[in-house]
């Protein structure tokens, strides 16, 4: 059976759905949900802190992991307060999965790209909650990747809800 797939437009909706799925592990793609691609260090630090605070409030969540294929790293400490908090830079999504293998199940990957985040979710057997903001707000590269991912979506996931 294929993992769950849903396309949602806001962080509130993504977190609500993760709670409904009783996910114990949440893996967040960093750009653009946590911090926009062109944002600076302060935006990354603030985004990681804010998303971690909100995600750890979901009952049953044991791990919150931020994962990006870029080299960006937060300068603030990840304070999980009872939740394991991790940050993986240069993650090599979707090819490298070893880092996530010990995380508790069920889990959800939350990100914007089917080709990287969605494929990672599929490889891990996790749900994929696709962050889908207004396409006009996306730079050309991510917009084109989104289009290509939608073409490949039927190969990775069942129909979206």
Regions found by a protein language model. Give the residues of each.
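Active-site residues of response regulator receiver
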Residues: 29
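Asp-based, Mg2+/Mn2+-dependent phosphohydrolase catalytic module
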Residues: 1-24, 34, 38-66, 73-108, ...
């Amino acid at each position: 059976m294929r993992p769950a797939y849903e396309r949602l437009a806001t962080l509130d909706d993504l977190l609500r759905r993760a709670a409904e799925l009783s996910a114990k592990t949440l893996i967040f793609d960093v750009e653009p949900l946590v911090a926009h691609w062109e944002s600076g260090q302060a935006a990354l630090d603030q985004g990681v802190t804010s998303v971690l605070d909100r995600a750890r409030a979901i009952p049953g969540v044991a791990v919150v992991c931020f994962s990006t294929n870029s080299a960006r790293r937060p300068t603030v400490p990840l304070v999980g307060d009872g939740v394991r908090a991790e940050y993986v830079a240069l993650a090599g999504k979707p090819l490298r999965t070893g880092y996530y293998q010990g995380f508790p199940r069920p889990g959800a990957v939350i990100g914007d790209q089917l080709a990287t985040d969605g494929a990672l979710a599929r490889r891990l057997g996790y749900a994929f909650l696709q962050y889908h903001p207004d396409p006009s707000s996306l730079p050309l590269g991510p917009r084109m990747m989104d289009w290509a991912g939608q073409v490949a979506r039927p190969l990775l996931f069942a129909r979206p809800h």
